[in-house]
C-alpha cells in the first residue's frame, strides 16, 4: 500500500433515506423495533467473521451502538460490496455498515452519519515488484477492486485497468497469482490481512502524501 496524493476520505454509515424523508425511515425503524444493516462480512478489521464465525468489526460495533441509541435491534444482512448500495436503494437494507466513503455523488443520493473514521489509501503489490511505488506508476497497469468502490475509481483515474472482484480475499489471490499488478485498499485493512495471511504477503508500497 502507498501513501498517495488523494483527498481525505470519510468513513461513515449510509442510510436509504434521502434528505427529503429521513424521518419516515426512522419512524419505520422504530415502529418495527429493528434496523437492518447491509455489510460484507469479509473486510477485516471493519466487518468480518472471527474464529467463532461471529460477525465482528469496527463498523459492526458502530452500527450496534447506533441501534442501541435508537432503542432497536441491529440486524446484519451480508452481501457483496457491489450489491450493497443497490440493496439500500431497493429497501433491503435501512443502512450500510461497511466503511462507506463519502463522495459528492453519493451525498446527493444518501444521508450519511458524521464521519467516524479517517483512513489512508494504499497500494498493494507483490513483494518482488519494484515497478509500482506511487499512484502515477499505476498507468497502464491492471488492478483488482470491487467495481463500484472508490478504490477502483481512483485507480482508473491514474490510468489503470480495473478487474472486478467480490472481496478482499479474491483480490489478494489475483495479485499473488500474478493476474493483476496491484490493488488499492485501506492501509489498516492490509495490516489486518497480514495477521491471518497463509501465503507469502504482498508488499505495502508507501508513497508521499497519501491519504484517504
Task: Name what the model sees in each region.
Residues 1-11:
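Bacterial lipoprotein signal-peptidase II cleavage site
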Residues 10, 19-99:
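Extracytoplasmic small-molecule ligand-binding "clamshell" domains
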Residues 26, 58-59, 107-117, 202-206, ...:
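A structural signal for short loop-to-beta-strand junctions that line the ligand-binding cleft
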Residues 38-43, 77-82, 91, 95-103, ...:
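Beta->alpha turn/N-cap motifs
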Residues 47-52, 63-72, 148-167, 194-199:
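Ligand-binding cleft/hinge of the Venus flytrap
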Residues 60, 76-86, 130, 148-149, ...:
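Short helix-initiation/N-cap motifs at beta->coil->alpha
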Residues 117-125, 187, 191-212:
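Periplasmic-binding protein-like
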Residues 126-142:
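Flexible hinge/capping segments at coil-to-helix
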Amino acid at each position: 500500500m502507498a501513501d498517495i496524493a488523494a483527498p481525505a476520505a470519510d468513513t461513515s454509515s449510509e442510510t436509504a433515506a434521502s434528505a427529503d424523508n429521513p424521518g419516515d425511515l426512522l419512524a419505520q425503524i422504530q415502529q418495527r423495533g429493528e434496523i437492518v444493516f447491509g455489510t460484507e462480512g469479509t473486510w477485516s478489521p471493519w466487518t468480518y467473521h472471527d474464529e467463532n464465525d461471529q460477525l465482528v468489526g469496527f463498523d459492526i460495533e458502530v452500527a450496534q451502538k447506533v441501534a442501541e441509541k435508537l432503542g432497536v435491534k441491529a440486524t446484519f444482512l451480508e452481501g457483496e460490496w457491489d450489491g450493497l448500495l443497490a440493496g439500500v436503494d431497493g429497501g433491503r437494507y435501512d443502512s450500510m455498515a461497511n466503511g462507506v466513503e463519502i463522495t459528492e455523488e453519493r451525498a446527493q443520493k444518501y444521508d450519511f452519519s458524521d464521519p467516524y473514521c479517517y483512513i489512508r489509501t494504499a497500494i498493494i503489490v507483490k513483494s518482488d515488484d519494484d515497478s509500482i511505488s506511487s499512484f502515477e506508476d499505476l498507468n497502464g497497469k491492471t488492478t483488482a477492486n470491487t467495481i463500484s468502490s472508490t478504490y477502483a475509481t481512483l485507480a482508473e483515474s491514474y490510468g489503470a485497468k480495473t478487474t472486478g472482484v467480490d472481496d478482499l480475499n479474491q483480490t489478494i489471490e489475483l495479485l499473488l497469482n500474478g493476474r493483476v499488478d496491484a490493488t488499492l485498499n485501506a492501509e489498516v485493512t492490509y495490516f489486518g490481512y497480514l495477521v491471518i495471511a497463509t501465503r507469502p504477503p504482498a508488499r505495502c508500497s508507501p508513497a508521499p502524501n497519501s491519504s484517504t
